[in-house]
């Protein structure tokens, strides 16, 4: 065994019928961790149900159904390998909560794969004003997914089949759109594929011999390697807190930045509670250190379960510890609000693992969301499609950071009426020091 392959996360985006499931299913089927026996079972069921289109979407449908029924599917099923990377597919969208997941998402995508329906009418529907293609691309960019691969899918169903003219037309239109969003189209491979027939997915297709660029698999291998933020100070948002007999209090969460190790003195914001980490575990094995991306449980001394909650953030007490946000300024894009938003609006913010009502205290400016130029000072309101800078005040103690320093703690979804009405990235935070914070004996000894 040589060096372990690098892990990357990809998010597959695009309009509802663009063929995301088929394409993703195909990759997982050909390159992935799905057990041959499982595939055979699916194939047999598909045949019994006369699903000729079993092909690959069926694999994904089965996985989703099993996941939704609460059958824990081995997460390996959402993984596949390229020559260079282990790829994990982040929750395939089309899902109501996709936007929320993408933001508070358990993981930030390293690359977006945009699937485009190249058929007549299909492409136009996806890219139209209210098509999801635009929204997904805008979200990916706003949320810091800087690399993108575009797949012109369903090339087997263009008129004529495998039409170069149609491909050229789509590349031109999508490039101009992606450029407006903020991407550099010259750096984006546009791969003509058929997720259904398999053209250019893994091997080069003779049906598309006019195309000289990479296959989808090649394009995934050409993603530039992500830098993991282990050299930043520790930030670990808590997902849950358990009391484990014989061990004590065990907070659980994902290391977003920095490193967590036994013996470290950590501070939990917003309360400022400070204590020593006794041990760190992942998948029931103890670790000498946990890095960004690791989902860990760690045991802390002299702390009651009731003193810690989901949404609290653990940090190193000696290295830029996290603190409560008194208020913060964010760039917000309204994507799905039926009316208009003015000062005093108080929706719920989902940021990392916290879920807290926040007041839009002051709409500071309205900006052009593409260029960032100011359009209006102190606008009366913001409506769908608008972007602006807003000063926000949490209604309860909350921990957030600027997007530039700690990206996973600096992006959020604004939820109202059971849907995501806006997304935002935090530009600056005014912090406040905790008062009367408890420092445990274990932590005092380490001082």
UniProtKB/Swiss-Prot annotation:
Q: What is its main location?
A: cytoplasm
Q: Where is this region: G2?
A: 70-74
Q: Which residues carry this modification: 5-glutamyl glycerylphosphorylethanolamine?
A: 289, 362
- What positions are modified (N6,N6,N6-trimethyllysine)? 79, 187, 306, 396
One biological process term from GO is: translational elongation
Positions of the region G4? 153-156
Task: Describe the family membership recorded for this protein in Swiss-Prot or TrEMBL.
Answer: Belongs to the TRAFAC class translation factor GTPase superfamily. Classic translation factor GTPase family. EF-Tu/EF-1A subfamily.
Q: What is the name attached to this protein's record?
A: Elongation factor 1-alpha
Any one Gene Ontology cellular component term annotated for this protein:
cytoplasm
Occurrences of domain tr-type G (ranges): 5-230
Give the sites modified to N6,N6-dimethyllysine.
Answer: 55
What disulfide bonds does the UniProt entry report for this chain?
Answer: none
Q: Which Pfam families match?
A: GTP-eEF1A_C, GTP_EFTU, GTP_EFTU_D2
User: Which keywords accompany this UniProt record?
Assistant: Cytoplasm, Elongation factor, GTP-binding, Methylation, Nucleotide-binding, Phosphoprotein, Protein biosynthesis
In this chain, the stretch annotated as G5 covers: 194-196
The Swiss-Prot or TrEMBL record annotates one GO molecular function as: GTPase activity
Residues modified to N6-methyllysine: 261
């Amino acid at each position: 065994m040589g060096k372990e392959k690098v892990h990357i996360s990809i998010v597959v985006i695009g309009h509802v019928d663009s063929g995301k499931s088929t394409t993703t299913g195909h990759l997982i089927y050909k390159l992935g961790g799905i057990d041959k026996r499982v595939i055979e079972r699916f194939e047999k069921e598909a045949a019994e149900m006369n699903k000729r289109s079993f092909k690959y979407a069926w694999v994904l449908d089965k996985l989703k159904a099993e996941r939704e029924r609460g059958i824990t599917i081995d997460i390996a099923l959402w993984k596949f390998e390229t020559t260079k990377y282990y790829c994990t597919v982040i929750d395939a969208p089309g899902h109501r909560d996709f936007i929320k997941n993408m933001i508070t998402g358990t993981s930030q995508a390293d690359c977006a794969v945009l699937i485009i329906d190249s058929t007549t009418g299909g492409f136009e529907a996806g890219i139209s004003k209210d098509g999801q293609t635009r929204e997904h691309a805008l979200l990916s960019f706003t949320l810091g997914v800087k690399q993108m691969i575009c797949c012109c899918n369903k090339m087997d169903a263009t008129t004529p089949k495998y039409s170069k003219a149609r491909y050229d037309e789509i590349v031109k239109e999508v490039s101009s759109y992606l450029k407006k969003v903020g991407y550099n189209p010259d750096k984006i491979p546009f791969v003509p594929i058929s997720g259904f027939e398999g053209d250019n997915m893994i091997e080069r297709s003779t049906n598309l011999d006019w195309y000289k660029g990479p296959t989808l698999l090649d394009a995934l291998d050409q993603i530039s390697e992500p830098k993991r933020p282990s050299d930043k100070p520790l930030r670990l948002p808590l997902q849950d807190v358990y009391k484990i007999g014989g061990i004590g209090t065990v907070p659980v969460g994902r290391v977003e930045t920095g490193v967590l190790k036994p013996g470290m003195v950590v501070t939990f914001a917003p309360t400022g509670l400070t204590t020593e980490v006794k041990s760190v575990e992942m998948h029931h094995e103890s670790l000498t250190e946990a890095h960004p991306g690791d989902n860990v449980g760690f045991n802390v001394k002299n702390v009651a379960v009731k003193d810690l909650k989901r949404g609290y953030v653990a940090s190193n007490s000696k290295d830029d510890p996290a603190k409560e946000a008194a208020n913060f300024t964010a760039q917000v894009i309204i994507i799905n609000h039926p009316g208009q938003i003015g000062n005093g609006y108080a929706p719920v913010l989902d940021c990392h693992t916290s879920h807290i009502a926040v007041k839009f205290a002051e709409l500071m400016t309205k900006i052009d969301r593409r260029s960032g130029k100011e359009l209006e000072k102190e606008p009366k309101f913001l409506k769908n499609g608008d972007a602006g800078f807003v000063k926000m005040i949490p209604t309860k103690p909350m921990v957030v950071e600027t997007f530039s320093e700690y990206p996973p703690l600096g992006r959020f979804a604004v939820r109202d009426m059971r849907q995501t009405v806006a997304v935002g990235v935090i530009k600056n935070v005014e912090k406040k020091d905790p008062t009367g914070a408890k420092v445990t004996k274990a932590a005092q000894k380490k001082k």
